[in-house]
């Protein structure tokens, strides 16, 4: 039986919600197109994203169709809708459609890669990663090492920001050299497109190139990627790349595109969890799914991964279309967000009397996120002293200090106050004893939002300096 696209319940209503003529001007006037609470100022788009009302209507239409006729929809219509979104995202990324499938999030994609790789039995394989790796992916590496009982190990590459791209490249080459000198085999590298904390653009293109030269598998964690930066997959040609669509592409949570070039698809034998598409090496179990026709085993494997709601995946094509028709396309969107992040971050730094996290070549803010130093530092940890550089020592001068043992208490207090009193959220971290706040630019924000953020953070920091965070302990 060949499934064909059918008109879905609520489809006309959803289409009507997308009839806005564009491109619309960016800034706060665009907020009416989104489902955000008017009382909430979303300065942290990078963590979970959000969606336009038009895409929410699309999501509901797919869910309604699934409930109206469960078996026909899940068995026959789902593969068609997945193919439509796969075609749309492949066109956006300029890659062959047979190289892309969907998973729930980037963490699942990284897990899928690391748990499918067959590690060498001689125990020499190493996984390389930077110390700015996303926490869940770092723990995935830890799990794989435990699960494989010693046949694979890891090597963490420390970075000191604001690092130059050349410094990152040099650190990676040095890690490869040390690995081999110690009798190890650098087998796979996990590489960010934009790291989480701090939120900075990473020279992933250069690192992938080195991986090719050194015959190391490149696994690119583009959790912060599609919809924010040009991934240039065709030029970069990574071995694996995963990018969350629900963060910057305006698709519902959770949804990520998983890119695997044909040359590597044989390495990904199982989805997570293993489902009907798995082909065992021994035996032949019954597969109850509708035959996939001329699709590859890789694509067929990811069409049904247990009974889950795939509606966010179906919305990818709708989100791409909405961004083109209403917002004017990817280039216009990215240009606005990057400019706002750079200029808005500088404004916040001026209000706080600090600085943004940027290197001398200006490569860290080639994205929609910016990190601003807060006007205090964390006291030295006697168990793990950090030797600051001359530049860092100068930055510390004249700032007040939070004792190391009170840092987490201050973090928790600041988060609670931002949420409860200011109706916003700003992720913060400390790197090299310095507190940093990460802000996300987006098309529905403008400079006034960053000015507000600067004043809010200034008030918050003044209250921290007075020790107010201790009162809630």
From Swiss-Prot:
GO CC terms: cytoplasm; nucleus
Quick check: keyword Nucleus in the entry? Answer: yes
What GO annotations for molecular function exist for this entry?
A: hercynylcysteine sulfoxide lyase activity (ergothioneine-forming)
What InterPro entries does the entry give? Aminotrans_V_dom (IPR000192), PyrdxlP-dep_Trfase (IPR015424), PyrdxlP-dep_Trfase_major (IPR015421)
Main localization of the protein described in the UniProt heading: cytoplasm
**What domain of life does the native source organism fall in?**
Eukaryota
**Pathway assignment:** Amino-acid biosynthesis; ergothioneine biosynthesis
Write the Enzyme Commission number(s) for this entry: 4.4.1.-
Q: How is it used?
A: Ergothioneine (EGT) exhibits antioxidant, anti-inflammatory and cytoprotective properties, leading to its growing application in the pharmaceutical and cosmetic industries. Also shows UV and gamma radiation protection activities. Finally it acts as a cation chelator and a regulator of glycolytic metabolism.
Which parts of the sequence carry N6-(pyridoxal phosphate)lysine?
Answer: 247
**Reactions catalysed, as given in the entry:** S-(hercyn-2-yl)-L-cysteine S-oxide + AH2 + H(+) = ergothioneine + pyruvate + A + NH4(+)
- Function recorded in the entry: Catalyzes the conversion of hercynylcysteine sulfoxide to ergothioneine (EGT) by cleaving the cysteine residue at the sulfur atom, the last step in the biosynthesis pathway of ergothioneine. Ergothioneine is an unusual thio-histidine betaine amino acid that acts as an antioxidant against peroxide in conidia and contributes to conidial longevity.
**Into which family does the record put it?**
Belongs to the class-V pyridoxal-phosphate-dependent aminotransferase family. EgtE subfamily.
Descriptive protein name: Hercynylcysteine sulfoxide lyase
- Name the species this protein comes from: Neurospora crassa (strain ATCC 24698 / 74-OR23-1A / CBS 708.71 / DSM 1257 / FGSC 987)
Phylogenetic lineage? Eukaryota, Fungi, Dikarya, Ascomycota, Pezizomycotina
The gene name on file is egt-2
